[in-house]
Amino acid sequence: MTNTLDDSIGSMQNCVSIVRDTSLKLRSRAQTPEETERIKKVLQLTRKYEEVTQSEVLAAQQRQAAEIAPQVQDLIGGVEKQISSLHSKERKLKSQSELNKSRLEQFPMTRREVVDVPRDADNVVEVTEEELQELEELQREREKLKMEISRLNLEKRKSVYGKLPQ
């Protein structure tokens, strides 16, 4: 606020200086009645600039601050709401990430882990196409059950710890 006041005062002083310089130049040229009339107007303008007191400048500055302050507060409130919304979204995404991570950890990484059959050359097992399809169907069923268990665990956590953001 002080910086703005200093800038305003400096600007006003610059304007007064320019008007004074101009009036001096006009006075030196004042040789005709038309120029004399013009000089009178310039001098009146100079007096108006010089009549603005520091208290008037401060009063104008206070009026301007009072006018702008509510708008600034509204803008700050809007920004705070947006930040709150972003924090909520962040918590929601973290929760979803943790859930997906736990689900991913439950899934087998390879088919070898699913079957749990050692692949040694001495221990070769022949499987028919029907048995392979049945095994794959059982694996799919097992995955569905794991997903259901994961969902139920999440619901249980929600009921125990309160509702998590969606």
Swiss-Prot record:
Residues 119-160 form a coiled coil. Its main location: nucleus. GO terms for biological process: attachment of spindle microtubules to kinetochore; cell division; mitotic sister chromatid biorientation; protein transport along microtubule to mitotic spindle pole body. Keywords: Cell cycle, Cell division, Centromere, Chromosome, Chromosome partition, Coiled coil, Cytoplasm, Cytoskeleton, Kinetochore, Microtubule, Mitosis, Nucleus. It holds the Pfam family DASH_Spc19. The keyword Nucleus applies. The keyword Transcription does not apply. It is found in: Nucleus; Cytoplasm, Cytoskeleton, Spindle; Chromosome, Centromere, Kinetochore. GO terms for cellular component: cytoplasm; DASH complex; spindle microtubule. InterPro entries: DASH_Spc19. Component of the DASH complex that connects microtubules with kinetochores and couples microtubule depolymerisation to chromosome movement; it is involved in retrieving kinetochores to the spindle poles before their re-orientation on the spindle in early mitosis and allows microtubule depolymerization to pull chromosomes apart and resist detachment during anaphase. Component of the DASH complex consisting of ASK1, DAD1, DAD2, DAD3, DAD4, DAM1, DUO1, HSK3, SPC19 and SPC34, with a stoichiometry of one copy of each subunit per complex. Multiple DASH complexes oligomerize to form a ring that encircles spindle microtubules and organizes the rod-like NDC80 complexes of the outer kinetochore. DASH complex oligomerization strengthens microtubule attachments. On cytoplasmic microtubules, DASH complexes appear to form patches instead of rings. Belongs to the DASH complex SPC19 family. This is DASH complex subunit SPC19. The gene is SPC19.
